[in-house]
Amino acid sequence: MNKKVYLILGLFCLLEGSNLFAQTQKVKNQPYGDYKLYHFGITIGLNFQDMLLTNSGLPAINSETGKEETWFATIPNYSPGFTVGLIADLFLNPYMNLRFTPSLSFGDKAFEFVEQEFSERFKTTIRSNYLMAPVDVKIRSMRLNNYRPYVIAGAFSALDLGLKKDEPLLLKPMNYGITIGLGCDFYLPIIKIAPEIRFCFGLNNVVEKNRTDLTDFSLMKYSDALTRGVPRMIIFTFNFE
């Protein structure tokens, strides 16, 4: 009798387990989509531009007042910009892809200069429209039903198309750096959508010290206040592939 009870309980548990497993396993959309040798897509989102500043701390004589002034620069706040671009993806293996994602990122950086002794303040906004060319390796986890997390890492170069001369600050047009990020692919019946966050860390100094473009030399003190400025950017995007 006990054997029959155990057998019935065992069959019941087996059936219930199979039912639960069937509930957790869903029909996979685009089951072979990740195995294409190459594919293309678009990316669209927001960016927040920043800059890692190194102040010189050196005093300078104001040509108008004759006073000695020491200015320090900060970026006190951030405003969102717009990013749009293309995606070219090359399959390497089931867990790794090589990606080229050229994009345009429109935005600005708000600088505030504060004079140390007299507490004078000066604010200016520098517009930066970056044509970016990142090359990344995309490393993916195992796919679970219709989503698949991933991380990215790579390098980028960028050309600033929005620079204007005769401004309080002049930035060099070219910069380069490294990128890291993460996201998650969501597989829909005919398209794959991925929310992604990307961190871009510049490596070169873009503050132009040779200000031959200035017509108002009283602005030179703001360039002199900085010895180094390295761009940084956070980009939130949705990728459609």
Roles of regions detected by a PLM:
Residues 146-148, 165, 169, 190-194:
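Short conserved catalytic/interaction loops centered on acidic-Pro-aromatic/His motifs
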Residues 29-38, 46-52, 87-161, 235-241:
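Gram-negative (and chloroplast) outer-membrane scaffold detector with strong preference
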Residues 27, 173, 187-241:
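Predominantly the C-terminal beta-signal and adjacent terminal strand-loop region
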Residues 54-75, 107-128, 161-171, 207-226:
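Flexible, solvent-exposed loop segments that connect beta-strands
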Residues 1-27, 238-241:
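Bacterial Sec-dependent N-terminal signal peptides
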Residues 21-79, 239-241:
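Short glycine/proline- and aromatic-enriched beta-strand/turn motifs that initiate or cap beta-hairpins
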